[in-house]
């Protein structure tokens, strides 16, 4: 069809029930920051810092949002975009109900727990598709359990009142080689993990934290 056939016999008409969903969602940053409702909040929080989204809606949601912000405010809508990939099946094929390879989240959470699922999700890199891997969840569950047990062990050592611990620690110089090594490694870990998070490389932060914990257990 051509434009001159719109609304004429043998031509076409627009569907009156179609709504462009991006018309409203492209204003997400403005709406969330109180545009037109709370001027002070909007001035402090727009543009936003981060938009997390999938790579499949760059040409729709991201593009529409950027255009609206430029048109209405001569501004970018946010300063950073975190693009996630898709979750693929273990054979790295796209999940779909018709193929029968869809995973039900509730069943996974019931089996491994939320911390294990978070561990697996955090091991994925931004912009890259990730295969569903229960093996990683098992590793994450093992780490979560060990962290809990180690925390209980440490908290049960000696005094638990903060004031007592502080008074006992004042003026004490660590001379044990293992203690000094642990603190040096911890300082390095904090520096590296912080740098990774600043660059949104949370998979890197997870890896070095995981390595640090197991090296001292």
Regions found by a protein language model. Give the residues of each.
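Structured secondary-structure scaffolds
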Residues: 1-158, 182-217
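S-adenosyl-L-methionine
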Residues: 159-162, 178
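Intrinsic disorder/low-complexity segments
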Residues: 162-174
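Aromatic-rich surface patch/π-platform used for binding flat ligands and interfaces
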Residues: 175, 179, 183
């Amino acid at each position: 069809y051509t434009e001159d056939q719109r609304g004429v016999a043998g031509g076409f008409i627009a569907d009156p029930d179609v709504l462009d969903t991006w018309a409203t969602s492209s204003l997400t940053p403005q709406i969330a920051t109180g545009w037109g409702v709370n001027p002070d909040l909007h001035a402090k929080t727009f543009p936003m810092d981060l938009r997390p989204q999938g790579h499949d809606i760059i040409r729709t949601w991201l593009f529409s949002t950027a255009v609206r912000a430029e048109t209405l405010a001569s501004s970018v809508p946010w300063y950073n975009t975190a693009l996630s990939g898709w979750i693929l099946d273990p054979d790295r094929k796209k999940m779909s109900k018709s193929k029968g390879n869809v995973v039900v989240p509730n069943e996974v959470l019931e089996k491994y727990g939320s911390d294990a699922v978070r561990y697996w999700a955090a091991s994925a890199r931004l912009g890259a598709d990730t295969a569903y891997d229960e093996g990683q969840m098992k590793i994450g569950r093992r780490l979560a359990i060990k962290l809990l047990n180690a925390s209980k062990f440490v908290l049960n050592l000696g005094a638990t009142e903060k004031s007592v611990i502080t008074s006992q620690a004042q003026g004490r110089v660590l001379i044990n080689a293992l203690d000094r090594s642990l603190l040096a490694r911890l300082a390095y870990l904090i520096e590296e993990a912080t740098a990774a998070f600043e660059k949104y490389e949370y998979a890197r932060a997870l890896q070095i934290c995981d390595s640090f914990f197991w090296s001292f257990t």
